Amino acid sequence: MARASPLLMICLVLGSSFATYNLVTMIIHYGSADSLATEDGGLFFDPIVEMPEHVKNTKTSKAPFHIALTATDAIYNKWQCRIMYYWYKKQRSLPGSEMGGFTRILHSGKADNLMDEIPTVVVDPLPEGLDRGYVVLNRPWAFVQWLEKANIEEEYILMAEPDHVFVRPLPNLAFGENPAAFPFFYIKPKENEKIVRKYYPEENGPVTNVDPIGNSPVIIRKDLIAKIAPTWMNISMKMKEDPETDKAFGWVLEMYGYAVASALHGVRHILRKDFMLQPPWDTETFNKYIIHYTYGCDYNLKGELTYGKIGEWRFDKRSHLRGPPPRNLPLPPPGVPESVATLVKMVNEASANIPNWDTL
């Protein structure tokens, strides 16, 4: 039997997504509540979604989740995936963890040399030119393909990224049909209502139904993400094709795509500020679960941040585009935040214990 071409599959996905987009008219009503955030980094409740009081402590059994991250076969992605997988294996078996299986969704279309090291499923990239130079558009397309072909034992899925490091064992932060997500300060649906309304019409409800999130990190029930993923792909591509949206959202366009797609399906997220930290802006790892090292960390020898200027001491993943960072990176000088020092120590531990670290 002949295999359908990637372009045909995309057309089918887009067709079903347009139907979904036109049919979904749900308005989910939530009681108002004041924003709550615990000083010790616990639950963060936004007026958008609040977990009802009577279910906060009713969890009686484990609900394992499958970890899935999308990646390319670029060396830059490979060394990050190796570090991420190392810490997943260390944290998975510790008390408090509900981490299940692991899949690297490789959207380069062909196998690479990490297939035997990291559990991997190969999917097709978008046809050439369709991403318009925005490689992140491959992420929703990768999830669409993976969800169609994968046999996932767990009921929940954590959507993660290569530059995530698990600081401690991660429990399932979702509750039933409410996924758990990290609130990003720069995702602002209300401030961008004029643009958001192009994809989330008024008849669907208030723009505050669109959560201030991206697709990662998110822990979500697999039947929900299976419904959302085609719409996420469709909306993201429509956003990229619209010059006004593309200019306004830039590199976070696909994050808005996921947020809008979720809202179109009536899915609301429990917002967890303790889900993740991002050095150097977040200075402590206490009570946090994931380090996201997306920002460069630059300091002088006095331990002062020199962001925007290359520091006398620095750690920036972009310094290692062509190969992995060397083993035993120098630790930051005194005065640098604990989160930065912890990140470097964790990178060093992983690189010291991963065989053939320098050969990618």
UniProtKB/Swiss-Prot annotation:
Pfam families: HPAT. It is found in: Golgi apparatus membrane. The chain crosses the membrane at residues 13-33. One of its GO terms (cellular component) is Golgi trans cisterna. Its EC number is 2.4.2.58. Its main location: Golgi. It is an enzyme of class 2 (transferase). It is a single-pass type II membrane protein. Coiled coil: none annotated. It catalyses: trans-4-hydroxy-L-prolyl-[protein] + UDP-beta-L-arabinofuranose = O-(beta-L-arabinofuranosyl)-trans-4-hydroxy-L-prolyl-[protein] + UDP + H(+). InterPro entries: HPAT-like (IPR056508), HPAT/SRGT1-like (IPR044845). Keywords: Glycosyltransferase, Golgi apparatus, Membrane, Signal-anchor, Transferase, Transmembrane, Transmembrane helix. The keyword Glycosyltransferase applies. PANTHER family: HYDROXYPROLINE O-ARABINOSYLTRANSFERASE 3 (PTHR31485:SF36), PEPTIDYL SERINE ALPHA-GALACTOSYLTRANSFERASE (PTHR31485). Glycosyltransferase involved in the O-arabinosylation of several proteins including extensins and small signaling peptides. Catalyzes the transfer of the initial L-arabinose to the hydroxyl group of Hyp residues. Probably involved in the arabinosylation of CLAVATA3/ESR-related (CLE) signaling peptides that move from root to shoot, to interact with SUNN receptor kinase signaling that regulates nodulation. Involved in long distance nodulation signaling events. This is Hydroxyproline O-arabinosyltransferase RDN2. The gene is RDN2.
